[in-house]
């Protein structure tokens, strides 16, 4: 894009095509977070996770299941807050795109912009599309 326009951009905003229920405010919030924190290379849109690895997530180990993270929490509300990256909005600084040799986004210094979880449905199947239509009628 820079070659085509002859302009240098500070950042890129990537809006995932399979998350059409995000709002203009969601995009503005993510961009504002990037403007507030110039030390962050990427802003990911996230929503509050419905599961928590310190409380109610497990992994299979051999012939049984174990906690993902060992803890003594007896309620999800006691555990540290965790978020799901919802892949709806990414605000990525130019320097990260141009200078970063590591393709793994999580290896950067990143921040988050929290969105309402009902606005996020990854449309990967016809069922997802029908669910999105039903939710869209109520937003």
Predicted regions, residues:
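Catalytic donor-sugar/metal-binding loop of nucleotide-sugar-dependent glycosyltransferases
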Residues: 101-121, 126-130, 134-139
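Glycine/small-residue-rich loop that forms an oxyanion/phosphate-binding "nest" at active or ligand-binding sites
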Residues: 1-6
């Amino acid at each position: 894009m820079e070659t085509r326009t002859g302009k240098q951009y500070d950042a890129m905003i990537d809006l995932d095509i399979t998350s059409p229920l995000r709002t203009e405010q969601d995009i503005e919030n993510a961009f504002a977070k990037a403007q507030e924190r110039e030390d962050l290379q990427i802003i990911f849109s996230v929503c509050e996770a419905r599961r928590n690895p310190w409380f109610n997530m497990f992994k299979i180990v051999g012939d049984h299941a174990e906690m993902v993270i060992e803890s003594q929490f007896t309620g999800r509300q006691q555990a540290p807050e965790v978020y799901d990256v919802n892949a709806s909005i990414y605000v990525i600084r130019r320097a990260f795109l141009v200078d970063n040799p590591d393709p793994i986004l999580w290896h950067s210094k990143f921040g988050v912009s929290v969105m309402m979880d009902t606005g996020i449905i990854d449309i990967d199947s016809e069922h997802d599309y029908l669910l999105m239509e039903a939710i869209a009628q109520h937003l």
